[in-house]
Amino acid sequence: MNRSSFDLLSTVEYGGCSAKLDPAKLSELLHDIPLPVDSRIMVDVSTHDDAGVYRLNDDTALIVTTDFFPPVCSDPYTFGRIAAANALSDVYAMGGRPLLVLNLTMFPSEGIPVEVLADILRGGQQTIDESGAFTMGGHTIDDPIPKYGLAVTGIVHPEHLVTNAGVRAGQCLVLTKPLGIGVAMAAHRLGLIGSEVYEAAIGQMCLLNRAGAELMQKYGIRGATDITGFGLLGHAKELAEASDVCLHIDSRSVPVLPECLSLLRDGCIPGATFRNLRFVGDMLRADCPTEYKMLLADAQTSGGLLMAVDADRAEDLVADLHRTGLHPFAAIIGYATDAEDAAKLIVT
């Protein structure tokens, strides 16, 4: 089947997870919104987790989440794949298995061929099929700027749930995918990188976090998150706050896409990076080169899992991630200690 050659990037200024609302503004907005109270609700928005969780019975809990955004790449089919992988990731980050999805689509009734929308949906369906979930329908509205994503329902055993609040002092931090997605995509739009770096970024965004979720269960991991629009620092902040720990990150151990550090040194810094640095604010104590600090705040789209694993099992976890053939970049990037002062993130 022929695929559309329409360039989706011509329709947007900000794409992917870099289009998220400023996290500081979002926190302020949600502050006065009343939370539901029910003994069956295991996770709500108070801990800024990746999804909500509702206990059905002693053996099953529902994971519910949604995610959508404007195009992050030119090709409609690839955009569909990335957006679906990003939405499904929230379920994986909670240690669950995606079960049912609904397509969420915003698309103009005029100006862009309808075949483009068909390609987006086909790309999304490829990734949904890879996850083992089932598409049950969706909703589409007329919007001048295309957007696509999913509402996802997953399941998890209540005793195997992974949350932001599950990190313990003494554990090591493992990251499954490289950083630099935001930098690479900005550089691509400016013509600063070749196809090799661009395709590497695309490949990471299309990759499901399924293998990482399965290994979290094998290793008994209970504290983790996925790294998306708030960058590694922003999501690590949410882990640290919910778990009441301090996270120590070795910036030079963090995996990074090719050329991204040199791009940052040369000033290719997406605007979302500064937004994310404002979000972590005084909780960050950084003693590292500027380009590494910027890398850690880079907004990721469909990024990897940041897991907290017992120190004596961290190297085995990384080896297992490598053996999947899907996560060659996986690495130990730091550790957790008891929180002692306002600094929840210490970067060296």
From Swiss-Prot:
Keywords: ATP-binding, Kinase, Magnesium, Metal-binding, Nucleotide-binding, Selenium, Transferase. The record marks K20 as: Important for catalytic activity. One of its GO terms (cellular component) is cytoplasm. Its EC number is 2.7.9.3. It holds the Pfam family AIRS. Binds 1 Mg(2+) ion per monomer. The active site is at C17. Its cofactor is Mg(2+). Mg(2+) binds at D50, D90, D226. GO terms for molecular function: ATP binding; magnesium ion binding; selenide, water dikinase activity. Gene3D superfamilies: PurM-like C-terminal domain (3.90.650.10), PurM-like, N-terminal domain (3.30.1330.10). It catalyses: hydrogenselenide + ATP + H2O = selenophosphate + AMP + phosphate + 2 H(+). One of its GO terms (biological process) is selenocysteine biosynthetic process. ATP binds at K20, T47, H48, D49, D67, D90, G138, H139, T140. Disulfide bonds: none annotated. Belongs to the selenophosphate synthase 1 family. Class I subfamily. HAMAP family: SelD (MF_00625). Synthesizes selenophosphate from selenide and ATP. Homodimer. This is Selenide, water dikinase. It comes from Porphyromonas gingivalis (strain ATCC 33277 / DSM 20709 / CIP 103683 / JCM 12257 / NCTC 11834 / 2561).
